């Protein structure tokens, strides 16, 4: 992994009681040892693999103002990180759920792009076996379950300040209040809505195939083409490029897909991140609720699976063998 650490600072917040968070600040930056580089590389890998929301700094963001001064050389990185950790403590103190943790600020470069990663990591206890096969207590940073994380694309922020996507953060699973406090600390608001872009893409694909008057099999082939392209981009860590996708769909219609989306006003960005859960809808139908979970390939609708919208009834012809065996065992046992 081509990852180079420029500067990295580590501080700590310790929860002493319900009202107080103690601040423990380092007096020096961490040295980028092999262990430190491996830790940051793991953080980068874990964070990059998660679904993220996109945002931008508010005009009054204290963090953005301090970061700008630091980037201009008016404040060193350690002082910037110490002051920011103090603001984080003050923001956390407003919430009853506030916990401590290890606060990390890392300025690093990956594939010619500069980033600032800010995260609060849990320092957990565990056990280890030493060389004498004795069991001893140990501590570790819970990187895999980190949920308070934000990353600023410094290159994008400085070269394209009007962007709505230079800041990314995790949202959803950690809860609304946790997301709120971290966004307040960052002085940021949500920008590009990647899920909405992906939903818009799916709608555009359906409308595009309908206007081209394709039959069912042809429509499904186009959806599979779109899914294959988007999934390849997702696996490669690349964004969906509307023009590239349009080339993949050349021949479907006399009008190119990119021209179609522009003319119909879908408001799709030229490029945007792929959202795995939304893209699955190109090839599958899935849903759950009320104790029922259903998942099937889209091509089966109208062939083995039929939906009657009037009665909201789904009819399945031919059940999977393992399900059929379970049903047979259960029904035979009840006779």
Swiss-Prot record:
GO terms for cellular component: bacterial nucleoid; cytoplasm. GO terms for molecular function: double-stranded DNA binding; single-stranded RNA binding. It is found in: Cytoplasm, Nucleoid. Keywords: Cytoplasm. Its main location: cytoplasm. It comes from the Bacteria. Belongs to the YejK family. This is Nucleoid-associated protein YejK. It comes from Salmonella enteritidis PT4 (strain P125109).
């Amino acid at each position: 992994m081509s990852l180079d650490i420029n500067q990295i600072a580590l501080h700590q917040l310790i929860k002493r009681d319900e009202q107080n968070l103690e601040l423990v600040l380092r007096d020096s930056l961490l040295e980028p040892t092999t262990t430190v580089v491996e830790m940051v590389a793991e953080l980068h890998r874990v964070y990059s693999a998660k679904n993220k929301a996109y945002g931008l700094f508010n005009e009054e963001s204290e963090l953005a103002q301090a970061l700008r001064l630091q980037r201009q050389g008016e404040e060193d990185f350690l002082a910037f990180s110490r002051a920011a950790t103090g603001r984080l403590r003050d923001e956390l103190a407003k919430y009853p759920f506030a916990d401590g943790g290890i606060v990390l600020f890392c300025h690093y470069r990956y594939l010619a792009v500069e980033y600032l990663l800010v995260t609060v990591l849990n320092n957990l206890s565990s056990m280890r076996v030493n060389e004498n096969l004795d069991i001893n207590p140990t501590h570790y940073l819970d990187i895999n379950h980190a949920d308070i994380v934000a990353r600023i694309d410094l290159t994008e922020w400085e070269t394209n300040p009007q962007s709505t996507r230079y800041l990314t953060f995790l949202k959803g699973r950690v809860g609304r209040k946790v997301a709120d406090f971290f966004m307040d600390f960052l002085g940021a608001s949500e920008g590009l809505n990647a899920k909405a872009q992906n939903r818009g893409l799916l709608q555009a694909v359906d409308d595009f195939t309908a206007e081209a008057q394709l039959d069912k099999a042809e429509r499904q082939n186009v959806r599979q083409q779109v899914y294959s392209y988007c999934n390849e981009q997702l696996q490669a860590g690349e964004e969906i490029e509307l023009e590239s996708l349009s080339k993949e769909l050349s021949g479907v219609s006399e009008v190119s897909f990119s021209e179609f989306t522009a003319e119909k006003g879908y408001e799709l960005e030229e490029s945007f991140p792929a959202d795995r859960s939304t893209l699955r809808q190109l090839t599958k139908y899935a849903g759950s609720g009320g104790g029922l979970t259903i998942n099937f390939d889209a091509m089966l609708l109208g062939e083995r699976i039929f939906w009657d919208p009037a009665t909201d009834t789904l009819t399945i012809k031919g059940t999977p063998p393992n399900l059929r065996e379970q049903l047979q065992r259960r029904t035979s046992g009840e006779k």
